[in-house]
């Protein structure tokens, strides 16, 4: 068994800025590498379930199974996700944490809200106040709360192929059901008697969770080699390439394209991108994290500008099929269509990419709703702005 404290919690160092899901996913992989664990069953609770879902979809070859307790797919309220915290509640909570963290009256109120069944237990209240005061400074508490609220993996749930067990309290029935409905073959078990946040501290209730986990894990057989993976797809295209080639002639254009390709490949290597194809003057590549893909797109754009070239870039995160070392599936043409909709010098991304880098500090400008040729539905697109 491997236990580790997420950034900003427990014995891990305080966070200077809110880590993204992608950064925290890298932490999971680093811990597994350090422990020489090639594959593992991931057990995560509450907002940590979003991290586990993203890891399982991105690294299916390293995930034997998932066990999620009171899972959440999104931290903030949305019309189709009414169980999450509203913007108003979130802002009020951030203000209270910033202004009142460490205050006994505030922490007592918070303890009674989180664990109403223990509201009159003076020993529990004393412990909770002691625990919260020593767990984080006000600034660290704000960062941790922001980390818990930001991030949205609703579009990733269907990409999880690992056997999945969801354990939940009765109060979380609908939210857990939402997650279970979107993970193929997921098993849902309601644990009666778990009324609030700190019920898990009850040894009897905790034993129930452990028993259900053991029963599920013992029944997980050999996991086949995955043929699908969550990836961020990148497409680039040189703006005005035909006119430029005609203006400078074929020999000069070939030399310029060679320098362009070298520049792109250098940035792909720097940001752990995988080159999948080149078509004329464009590149098709994949990444295991959307934040790295955006950073790489910006770097490519600046690098080729030194050659007097302007590009457009499109990014989309989705489930892909592995085909003889290549990636296929609807996510690939979707990424290509996003790139086609980008303006000169623009890094255009789908809403899925934007949701997955929440908390990164990356700024986006809304580019409206688009129909992408050959792709069902309409798509909200955003330009990633390099500050």
Per-region residue spans from a language model:
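Ligand-binding pocket scaffold of soluble enzyme catalytic domains
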Residues: 1-220
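Hydrophobic alpha-helical membrane-association signature
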Residues: 24, 209, 256-260, 296, ...
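Short linear capping/connector segments at secondary-structure termini
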Residues: 126-130, 145, 278-283, 316, ...
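Conserved beta-strand termini and adjacent loop/short-helix elements that scaffold enzyme active sites
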Residues: 191-193, 278, 350, 367
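Catalytic NTP-binding/metal-coordinating core of nucleotidyl cyclase/transferase enzymes
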Residues: 219-298, 302-303
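Long, domain-scale regions corresponding to catalytic signaling modules most often appended to membrane systems
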Residues: 222-223, 385-387
